[in-house]
Amino acid sequence: MKDIDMGKEYIIPSPGYRSVRDRSTIPGTHGDREDPSSGEQISLECQDALETAARVEGLSLDISVHSHLQILDEEHTKGKYHHGLSALKPFRTTTKHQHPVDNAGLFSYMTFSWLSPLAQVVHKKGELLMEDVWPLSKYESSDVNCRRLERLWQEELNEVGPDAASLRRVVWIFCRTRLILSIVCLMITQLAGFSGPAFVVKHLLEYTQATESNLQYSLLLVLGLLLTEVVRSWSLALTWALNYRTGVRLRGAVLTMAFKKILKLKNIKEKSLGELINICSNDGQRMFEAAAVGSLLAGGPVVAILGMIYNVIILGPTGFLGSAVFILFYPAMMFVSRLTAYFRRKCVAATDDRVQKMNEVLTYIKFIKMYAWVKAFSQCVQKIREEERRILEKAGYFQSITVGVAPIVVVIASVVTFSVHMTLGFDLTAAQAFTVVTVFNSMTFALKVTPFSVKSLSEASVAVDRFKSLFLMEEVHMIKNKPASPHIKIEMKNATLAWDSSHSSTQSSPKLTPKVKKDKRAPKGKKEKSRQLQHTEHQAVLAEQKGHLLLDSDERPSPEEEEGKQIHAGSMRLQRTLYNIDLEIEEGKLVGICGSVGSGKTSLISAILGQMTLLEGSIAVSGTFAYVAQQAWILNATLRDNILFGKEFDEERYNSVLNSCCLRPDLAILPNSDLTEIGERGANLSGGQRQRISLARALYSDRSIYILDDPLSALDAHVGNHIFNSAIRKRLKSKTVLFVTHQLQYLVDCDEVIFMKEGCITERGTHEELMNLNGDYATIFNNLLLGETPPVEINSKKEASGSQKSQDKGPKPGSVKKEKAVKSEEGQLVQVEEKGQGSVPWSVYWVYIQAAGGPLAFLVIMVLFMLNVGSTAFSTWWLSYWIKQGSGNSTVFEGNRSSVSDSMRDNPFLQYYASIYALSMAVMLILKAIRGVVFVKGTLRASSRLHDELFRRILRSPMKFFDTTPTGRILNRFSKDMDEVDVRLPFQAEMFIQNVILVFFCVGMIAGVFPWFLVAVGPLLILFSVLHIVSRVLIRELKRLDNITQSPFLSHITSSIQGLATIHAYNKRQEFLHRYQELLDDNQAPFFLFTCAMRWLAVRLDLISIALITTTGLMIVLMHGQIPSAYAGLAISYAVQLTGLFQFTVRLASETEARFTSVERINHYIKTLSLEAPARIKNKAPPHDWPQEGEITFENAEMRYRENLPLVLKKVSFTIKPKEKIGIVGRTGSGKSSLGMALFRLVELSGGCIKIDGVRISDIGLADLRSKLAIIPQEPVLFSGTVRSNLDPFNQYTEEQIWDALERTHMKECIAQLPLKLESEVMENGDNFSVGERQLLCIARALLRHCKILILDEATAAMDTETDLLIQETIREAFADCTMLTIAHRLHTVLGSDRIMVLAQGQVVEFDTPSVLLSNDSSRFYAMCAAAENKVAVKG
């Protein structure tokens, strides 16, 4: 296997990574490549850091899209249709890396023979791996087609403007040449399909009525029948061949264009993450289906007109009746299909909501489990699912009508036509009757494809609207204006900026400031300093401006808008956040930014990064950015790749960065050092590790401007000091650095300090100048000094020595816990997605049957299907029987002569035959309605039960499952797989069951007329068996590959959306786009082959069907005079019907099995996922008022995160007294977070026990335990919904209690400003609140809960010092009678604790009062305090 060279030898093969198959150019692996659109050279260091994700998923990298473009450019000079026309050449040469379809001749192309070698490979191996699959053709590559679609869309926008622009017209132009050609092929199919029944079958049946035999003439008729069927089959195959390639090109183009747009968005507030995932999974599929099936709609009117004309010629005026039935049914089917599409459209919205909520649940599952909110979220998802199910049921009824109409309409048309024809006194012969019936059968093609076509076009129409709304969203524009002075890096002049928020939101999107300072020290008089010390003159009007919603008339153009990018009227609302910002930052300056929670610090740096809308003033920037977000964004890649972020590996610089960011000790405890794979969102890292990796990425990038948003908040004092001095002050000495922080001691060393308040810069200058100003800054800094003065003197000389050593050892619980247990695969965290092998086991079908209601329900459904098809067959047989009876031996008198009549109109029982014939139609309609209702209810019950059981299993899975499984993979089960089970599987299963029974009836009818027919069926059955065995494996394996390649690109979308700000700042859009194109093309390759494999089978099955109809024709010829013409007509009509039906049925069998792989994947999770302990254990529930005291006892507690991993807690024993306040400190990897994991039983103990008030927590249910504990997490978590639902999901508290909690957390005024107060919307991830505000709401949530035991995990890290002090005071008061465990890195937050617990290497090494520990200068706690305390004491 080739290693991918991304900078020396730093990427090594992972077990999940497969060979790259002799590809000359691999995206993201070769240096110096040219982007045709920009002409820029993209060197090796600009490659996508997500390369390694492919290894985990077992994916390959396709031929470079750039090499594609080069080849296409060369071919473009030969003519636009050169490649298409070259298929007509009798001799062709194969070029390297060419997809077989590109080299296929016309015969091979339309019969899909180019796919046969792959079918042979699969048959021999019994399975299919990605290395067996050809890379996607250069003509189908997503990049090539995206560029074309993008150009067409841009031309449309330029021509008519964004409001009038039609994406439908653009899509039509994109596809039209190939679609027109496919429609021409479809016309040939229709003409051939019509000619056989209309002319050949008619003459053949007339021949059976003739008394004389003419063998030569009759054999020519059979030959004609054979030829028309072959032309029909192959021209239809060519239609599909063209449509499938068109569909794949359109899907690749529109999905790539969508992701390209996502990467350019300012924010995604108008689109939820669930909607974007749905767009990129289901909507892309709908665009493909529209291109593949939509053009078949054109065949309907043609065959209807031809059939009507022909029937009138055969029967006279009554021929209009049957055609009228078809003509009436055609718009009726269109209407029903549109109704189906309407309900599908409503269902899509419900699915979006469900997927979004599922994504939220999966993202914050740890928090949901700890808060015992599993039931609340389960009910929320179930409520959405119930609404989705209700809509699906309505859509299912209409869909069932469309499936069953085709065979019914033939009977209805026949009954109406022949009954009226006979009633009016016209005669009817077998040749006439069965020619008309056969023509009716050929006309059903229009009705068969109508539900597919209309459904696909209607759903695509919805998808197009969603894509268009995405394409018209406002893009982020990096600031291009340069400051006037070369020494100035950032310049803002009188800048007023606003955040964009969703237009549909019930509220504005506030970045509000909690009024934490009211009744506090008022700012003293301010003086104007020479260094432009600023205090805003707008304090009087801030309250009025705050929360002011800007309507469209208030929108003012930004520099970006002046370049043609405008905010469209009514498209969004703007929330003013920053006011009249005047700022100049010189090159090489370290600028500290501070202020209270929600004061606008993050907004200020977002404005500099171009993330906000400029309303007034100007912004100018000179240089490139490196950005460290407040909540670190970590890729699912190796630790090294996260730091390199696509740049070339420079060992010296890399090692220097590791040292500056204190990452060396962490590498020592990771199983594969810096090549250890990091989970999604840094799942196997602590908050501090994530932040340091994010900082290391910035340092390694070597940019000119560094924007650091509170990068030290999650770090302990020693590490924070080291990083500030070594990384920020020393390493970035010559760089321009914007350093946002709440830890004011660091501002002492900044060249300049900016203090923000309510969206304005109120103070600015050096630390000394601001202290002399004696304003807000001096007030909060003095509070810091007062609050942190230790009771004993600390000598800080030891800070750099002894304390560092303890960090080098000991397993880091957050990292060790989620590693792969098997040592041979060290460093690999995310497990390769399982892929089923062999055929779908019967147990999967049994699971589906059981979910649908059990064997009895299945038997009832099957009986209804048989009765339904049987009633259709009976009506046709009754017609032949009626014709055979003729006059019923009635005697006709002509003058003096009498003779036996042959005319049916003379039959004395005419009314009897006609009544039975009409009654059969009524019975058939009733049975169809009953069958439809029962089938829809059964399949929906199955899909709903599978969904509910899957959801239950996922929610009850232990944390190790979520740590080793990408969210995209789990979401794939709930989005694409559930879509298959909800919609596509029932649709195809219904047709399959109906058609397979119909096939047996057809063969039975023909065999009843010609018993010798069964002799010919024998060899054909052998051929069919061989085909079925080969195709079944091929189709099933390709479908499985399609399923597993879907997950990585969905994960990539999710990850990219979460890191949009970072991607923008580092200007890595192109690299992430290339990675997406690779993942999409890897999915498109098996997806395209899967669709082609269906037609490969269909063409070959059609040959068997043609053999059957030819055999029937020969039987009629050779048994001339032995068989009544009525029965001969019956046989030939069923034989003609069998031609398309047989291949369609067998293809449906393979496709239905392929769809069942989604059931298999869902069932795999249901059967294999291990479960946590029960939520409640009967007879073991603790007392209702437990715990009364809050005493916690650990007795020799041992814990490891998975088997075969080292212990992270080693025989830990201690007792925490009731109401005691404990501070827990320790270096990274010491086991602090593991204590919390053990207490909440997120991981079960390996040994020992934990007791709360004497009750062993392992003996009670998880809900009983977790509901009695409260936690305020390190990273604040808000869910989409309302403020109330975030604080009180179970509606347990009164409004007064909620407002009281908000007041005590200083969020009351913030929430009171919102239009809907407690019912105001909280956006996904709480994006309409700052990180500090989110944390305050989390504290309010804990206040409401008021448990006897509270764990604070660095709960106030995202707050300014003053808010921190106020909140600490609130917590002390509110939880005075509670046992409180505080895990902290900022040591001043635990100095007031009753006792301090110091952990090292999973053991308690010190546990005493702060005064005792600080009086011992050799204690670990003393050494840890030295860094922070010394800094404030000396510099302050």
UniProtKB/Swiss-Prot annotation:
For whether the record's keyword set contains Nucleotide-binding, the answer is yes
Q: Name one GO cellular component term.
A: Golgi lumen
> In this chain, where does the modification Phosphoserine occur?
S14, S19, S43, S60, S505, S509
Which ranges carry the ABC transmembrane type-1 domain? Answer: 179-459, 858-1154
Quote the biased-composition stretches of kind Polar residues, using this chain's numbering: 499-511
Q: Where is the composition biased (Basic and acidic residues)?
A: 19-36, 545-559
Answer whether the UniProt record assigns the keyword Chloroplast to this protein.
Answer: no
E.C. number:
7.6.2.-, 7.6.2.2
Gene3D superfamilies tied to this protein = ABC transporter type 1, transmembrane domain, P-loop containing nucleotide triphosphate hydrolases
Reactions it catalyzes: ATP + H2O + xenobioticSide 1 = ADP + phosphate + xenobioticSide 2; 3',5'-cyclic GMP(in) + ATP + H2O = 3',5'-cyclic GMP(out) + ADP + phosphate + H(+); 3',5'-cyclic AMP(in) + ATP + H2O = 3',5'-cyclic AMP(out) + ADP + phosphate + H(+); N-acetyl-L-aspartyl-L-glutamate(in) + ATP + H2O = N-acetyl-L-aspartyl-L-glutamate(out) + ADP + phosphate + H(+)
Question: According to its UniProt record, what is one Pfam family this protein matches?
Answer: ABC_membrane
> What's the superkingdom here?
Eukaryota
So where does ATP 1 get bound?
Answer: G595, S596, V597, G598, S599, G600, K601, T602
Q: Report how it sits in the membrane.
A: Multi-pass membrane protein
Question: Top EC class per UniProt?
Answer: translocase
**Where's it found, cell-wise?**
Basolateral cell membrane; Golgi apparatus lumen; Endosome membrane; Cytoplasmic granule
For the ligand (ATP 2), the binding residues are G1226, R1227, T1228, G1229, S1230, G1231, K1232, S1233
General function of this protein? ATP-dependent transporter of the ATP-binding cassette (ABC) family that actively extrudes physiological compounds, and xenobiotics from cells. Mediates ATP-dependent transport of endogenous metabolites such as cAMP and cGMP, folic acid and N-lactoyl-amino acids (in vitro). Also acts as a general glutamate conjugate and analog transporter that can limit the brain levels of endogenous metabolites, drugs, and toxins. Confers resistance to the antiviral agent PMEA.
Q: What is this protein called?
A: ATP-binding cassette sub-family C member 5
Source organism (scientific name): Rattus norvegicus
